[in-house]
């Protein structure tokens, strides 16, 4: 199953809850790849965003993720420009992941960082070792 199909396979199980089945092809050993775990949590959080863009994500990988999982989103705070949402992913063995997402509205800025030139830096051979000399 490809990524897009897996993301679309989620089923609403409550107001802010979704269930997914993670096939073995998405496993690395006994758990699911971390990026997929984070993406499933984000998928459950998106309906709480109010159309705002994702601005930050913090994900704690608590336990193995495999088979059937349920992601439940909780709206922590909604302001004029930002939304904070937590997601708990539960699997067959209990809590699998906890995530907090911040969504924010686009804001115009007088600052433009798009085309800044790269700074001048020394080559790695000319830079002092951070760890000291190696044996």
Question: How does the language model describe each region?
Answer:
Residues 1-135:
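Terminal targeting signals and extreme-terminal segments of soluble enzymes
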